[in-house]
Amino acid sequence: AGYAAYLVGGGVRDLLLGKHPKDFDVATDASPEEVRALFSNCRLIGRRFRLAHVHFGREIIEVATFRGHHENGEGEGVVENGMILRDNVYGTVEEDAMRRDFTVNALYYNIADFSVVDYTGGLQDLKQHKLRLIGDPMVRFKEDPVRMLRAIRFAAKLEFQLHETIDRLIAEQGKLLANVPAARLFDEILKLFLSGHGVSAYHLLKEHDLLQYLFPLTSPLLKDDDYSDRFISQALANTDTRIQQDKPVTPAFLFAALLWLPVRQQAGLLQQQGMTPLQAMQVAGDDITREQVSYVTLPKRFSFPMREIWINQVRLEMRRGKRALRLLQQPRFRASYDFLLLRNQAGESLQELCDWWTAFQEQSDEQQRQMINQLNKGQGQGKKRRRRSRKKNSARKSSAS
């Protein structure tokens, strides 16, 4: 059709690093509308960045038009306080390279002659395992503060060193994240922690003081080499392992772990005020969730099971009667049980409870009833039957006569 097109971005970067690319993006001088005219299986998405998605069976190829500078490009762009709100300004391939975030993501594979085109020094940075922003880092972070989180994510994923200027500015300019929509921050958190490199990302976020802008209720409770730090680190280590083993992971469990510290603290305070453990956990879970979503959106399809995981931590201790059997049938039982094991791993004294539930799941119906009966007997032995005083009974009889 006469248009220029290049493979670009993470796919090219990963190939050069000897990694298996997750997907390939295409950059072209064709406008989104021209791409749509070429492919019947194409749909246009996005307002902030207009993109073409070309569908091939289950595969989607993302096609972006070369971006230009806002001063002289063609198209539509909106900038407010240095932050780009809409970026549909088109230009040349050289301008497109300068508009990308990191040098290692601005490598273009020319399909025509099988060459790699590098306008920003990305090949050299790849060799040195260094993550460097294109252009003035302060300007680039103001244009899009999420670039700070992307820098953390790529440094964790690629095991690259942050360029010293980025390293310093991220810690200084984290407050810019307050300008990012809460829904977008939710998406970025999933990319940070559900990519198989969550532990590294967590430590980098802590090191650069960014957690306070994502989880302001959790951040003040974190202390090095303490239960709090061990709990989050262990939760993310377990998640990383599941991802590496191609096992499913859910944002509900992730957020349950990331918000457990303030929920646990709040529930403890509410119990001191006279609430039952179950009431305290329900109220604490609702309060912390309500406050957290003002910073980072959490869709109800995840917030509801997240709160259920917390409430079930209390129910897991209430095993007598038919409660244990009812809990075992609950859809969130497995996640709640795994959460209990996680708490024990991090240092809470829950080994006996963990062992009981581990054994209980593996027993037959009859053996499960026997295990519950043992608990009921233990409860009965703990409570002595009160007897009336004989003297008082005798006195009552005398007065009656």
Located regions from the model:
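Catalytic cores of the polymerase beta-like nucleotidyltransferase superfamily
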Residues: 1-401
